[in-house]
Amino acid sequence: MKKKGLRSVIEAIQDLLKGKTTTMPKSHSGEGIFFTSKASDLFILDSFGHQLSIQTLLGDVKVKQISASKRGTRVIFEISVDSKLHLNDVFKKFTNLTDSSDFGFDKTEIRVKLYTTSGVHISRSQARRILTGLEKFKIILLDFDKVPVVGQAFADEIYRVFQNAHPDILIQEENMSEGVKFMVERAKNEARK
């Protein structure tokens, strides 16, 4: 965590979920945990008193505190013997397949709800936390599921400031409430001026 300038275990988990996260870029691509978690039915990481649980079939990702009974990290990987999931499909989902693409790992999905503890996304600093490291991707999908509203500064940081600094990155959204959609469209319109 210190090497990457992260302030908490939660920030480390958030970075893992983005993909392309490694402290040793010459030795590791930062894709291992990301793709392994997507290729399972259930993937659990227990470390430093926190648990990351990914239930791929349900599309559910949870982070919670647990009792830190032992040192180190525990990994649970479950997949049904008759799983219909193919590793090739997992890689394709996070690969830009357009003609101009190099077919690398250049697409990520961010579950916005996992980036706050209070349930509200208002501040510019919260948006910056989400955006940290995303300049490495060409396509960013922001999933706003269970996010009721975002603030003006939050939306402005993503859709005007970040987007203007990185015009070649495509930012997509899904599962927006009416409140979120209003602020996102407002920020996009301001960015066009």
Would you name each region that the model predicts?
Residues 90-112:
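Short, cationic low-complexity segments
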Residues 114-192:
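Amphipathic alpha-helical interaction surfaces in cytosolic regulatory modules
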Residues 1-67:
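Flexible ATP-lid and adjacent glycine-rich G1/G2 motifs of the Bergerat
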Residues 49, 80-84:
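Two-component histidine kinase transmitter core
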Residues 66-69, 81:
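Catalytic phosphate/metal-binding cores of nucleic-acid and nucleotide-processing enzymes, i.e., regions
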Residues 1-2, 85-93:
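Short, charged, solvent-exposed linker or helix-capping segments at domain edges/interfaces
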